[in-house]
Amino acid sequence: MATAASNPYSILSSTSLVHADSAGMQQGSPFRNPQKLLQSDYLQGVPSNGHPLGHHWVTSLSDGGPWSSTLATSPLDQQDVKPGREDLQLGAIIHHRSPHVAHHSPHTNHPNAWGASPAPNPSITSSGQPLNVYSQPGFTVSGMLEHGGLTPPPAAASAQSLHPVLREPPDHGELGSHHCQDHSDEETPTSDELEQFAKQFKQRRIKLGFTQADVGLALGTLYGNVFSQTTICRFEGLQLSFKNMCKLKPLLNKWLEEADSSTGSPTSIDKIAAQGRKRKKRTSIEVSVKGVLETHFLKCPKPAAQEISSLADSLQLEKEVVRVWFCNRRQKEKRMTPPGDQQPHEVYSHTVKTDTSCHDL
């Protein structure tokens, strides 16, 4: 007892080490060289999953060598062969059909737990040299294998396994266009018919006394489709697309029928047109009448109200038309004459501020 107390290292050399594993208390090998002990203990603590604490199948060393004989005869050493293509395909199918199997827990690391052939020990090469476990491509940062070493299914298989709602819908544009075309073959007019209708529509619209804005407003009030004056103008000029021309033709045709049936009697179209006319129609003056007005303008650029009334009566024009003509003529004279070359009879026009607001109505 005294000898044992005086030499505490003899206990380590005479007794064997005991490892506390999950399988039970196992007797270890006697104390050896510290360098060899570190290598063997490290290999004992690194199974196929790379976790240093999960050694379930590695037993104690039986001799004093750096590599254990039990490790050489272990199931992993016997399976030190790369899996074949059939095994990989089988593993991919198993992973594709049962994704939850791939995410196994650390307690099922035994090679025989898988249906496919077990993978070789990643920490030992064929020559018996240790490798860095954490540098292997099959390991993650935590040391666990991704999906049990099985490769993910290809992109084509994953696309086919999607729900029909999640898949990319097919292009129905061509199908829809063919369907619409087959459905409206009988009603679709030709380009010649559209051109002829546009000419007839313009002539009849002018004959009835409606403007393009009146037609657009009437279509919006009667049929619920509001069109601007620009749209009607482009239709008459054949500047719309063929599809839009086909859509607008039946509406304009209905408007023409309604306008023709209501000719000579005030109807809703006349009321709508009257509401849409926010300004008066442009008056066209004949050349002879313009000559008389021009002669009177040279004599008196700004006639009085009585002169405008008498001149309108002599020319059989409205008083407002004559007044607007003189107003526009004075504005035109200002634009044509430079500021330094004004005539004496136009000097007084700068003092009149009411004339500057005159416009052609």
UniProtKB/Swiss-Prot annotation:
One of its GO terms (cellular component) is nucleus. This is POU domain, class 3, transcription factor 4. Brain specific. It is found in: Nucleus. The modification Phosphoserine is found at S265. InterPro entries: HD, Homeobox_CS, Homeodomain-like_sf, Lambda_DNA-bd_dom_sf, POU, POU_dom, POU_domain_TF, TF_POU_3. It comes from the Eukaryota. GO terms for biological process: brain development; cochlea morphogenesis; negative regulation of mesenchymal cell apoptotic process; regulation of transcription by RNA polymerase II; sensory perception of sound. Belongs to the POU transcription factor family. Class-3 subfamily. Residues 165-183 have a biased composition (Basic and acidic residues). It comes from Homo sapiens (Human). It is linked to Deafness, X-linked, 2: A form of deafness characterized by both conductive hearing loss resulting from stapes (perilymphatic gusher) fixation, and progressive sensorineural deafness. One of its GO terms (molecular function) is DNA-binding transcription factor activity, RNA polymerase II-specific. Keywords: Deafness, Disease variant, DNA-binding, Homeobox, Non-syndromic deafness, Nucleus, Phosphoprotein, Transcription, Transcription regulation. SUPFAM superfamilies: Homeodomain-like, lambda repressor-like DNA-binding domains. It holds the Pfam family Homeodomain. Signal peptide: none annotated. PANTHER family: POU DOMAIN, POU DOMAIN, CLASS 3, TRANSCRIPTION FACTOR 4.
